[in-house]
Amino acid sequence: MKVHRMPKGVVLVGKAWEIRAKLKEYGRTFQYVKDWISKP
């Protein structure tokens, strides 16, 4: 599972179940993708 933060978005690389789990995990912390990519 790899997570690449780009200036305008996020690229998730992995199996479908890994990506769904990671999105749920980040969904608890960040409400919007904008918040996720602006975080240092």
From Swiss-Prot:
Quaternary structure and interacting proteins, as annotated: Interacts with FtsZ. Binds to the C-terminal polymerization interface of FtsZ. Binds to FtsZ filaments.
Species lineage: Bacteria, Bacillati, Bacillota, Bacilli, Bacillales
Regulation: Highly effective in inhibiting polymerization at low and intermediate concentrations of GTP and only partially effective at high GTP concentrations.
Disulfide bridge partners, by residue number: none
A Gene Ontology BP annotation from the UniProt entry: sporulation resulting in formation of a cellular spore
The UniProt record lists the keyword Transferase: no
UniProt function note: Blocks Z-ring formation in the mother cell during sporulation by inhibiting the polymerization of FtsZ. Binds to the minus end of FtsZ and functions as a filament-capping protein. At high concentrations, is capable of both capping and sequestration of FtsZ. Decreases the GTPase activity of FtsZ.
Pfam families to which the protein is assigned, alphabetical: MciZ
Induction: Expression is regulated by the mother cell-specific factor sigma E.
InterPro entries in alphabetical order: MciZ
Protein name: Cell division inhibitor MciZ
